Amino acid sequence: MKAVVCTKLGEPNLLEIKEVDKPTINKDEVLIKVEVAGVNFPDALLVQGKYQIVIDPPFIPGNEVCGIIEDKGENVDIPLGTKVIGIPPIGGFAEFVAINKNLVIPVNMNFDSLAGASLPINYGTSYYALKRRANAQSGESLLVLGASGGIGTATIQLAKVMGLKTICAVGSDDKAEYVKSLGGDEILRYDQVDLKETVKELTDGKGVDIVIDPVGGEVSEQALRATAFNGRLLVIGFANGEIPKISLNLTLVKGVSIVGVWWGRWTNTSPHETAEDFSELVSFVESGKLNIVPKNNYKIEDTSIALENFLNRKNIGKTVISV
């Protein structure tokens, strides 16, 4: 089978497209013929050896796919030929991937594969952050940092479903235009306004109830200063490469909670709640509440380009590769 293989940790251009053996499955696994695989910022970090978890080469990156079950182990009840969304630990950037039966979600055959491969990481993380970490309530205000990225765009769409008002922060006009097309309520440019003062103005002096922060760096403290009393700052990642050093006295005087969001670990410790959330996300798509259309669709041969765009901060919206 064709696969994207990391043979040496480093820049994405070191990745190789190789012919390798199909993975073998154990009694609790399914073999999925991959149609589409989602691409995310952590994939770029993983091949560099800079992610929270370091994997020794050689390995196949990629941990969200949509495809068809071609084979299954004896302990698997899902029928052959079922379309599924899968969340493999690694191995997704390939024509076939073996996944534990507990990490696949059956969907209807007419479920769009592009949407299926886009759903797990970005929408799963955002929904977990808003629903379970922030306990977001309809009518609350939400500041989305890095609003044009995969997490940001998923958050904007889910905020609409959950009845939240969004303030979307971006770094360029083309990103602002894309965010507006997704239904962002208010859009601001980091480089053109004072973040704290602008957010205060947009919330009648109160500040925002919730901040989604996949960016990090100095903007994190600016966002914290823009929160309302008893607000919540949700830390999802550090896309700009800088882990912020925040003045903790702000949490005292503002009563703000700084909450970590590691969706991947939560899926392992809370499988039943994960399944519940996925069922809800799939229903949002099937009912038309969520319209997931990846902005960037690459060929598998161009995976390294897709990952480089994350590192260069050129990525807008959700990225997938068609296998």
Model-predicted regions and their roles:
Residues D21-G38, K50-G91:
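Glycine-rich beta-strand-centered segment in the early N-terminal region that forms part
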Residues G92-E95, G171-Y178, I243-L248:
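Short, glycine/polar-rich helix-capping loops at beta-to-alpha or helix-loop-helix junctions
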Residues V170, E218-K289, S322-V323:
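Glycine-rich phosphate-binding loop and adjacent beta-alpha segment
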Residues L119, Y123-Q192:
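Mid-domain Rossmann-like dinucleotide-binding core that forms the NAD(H)/NADP(H) cofactor-binding site
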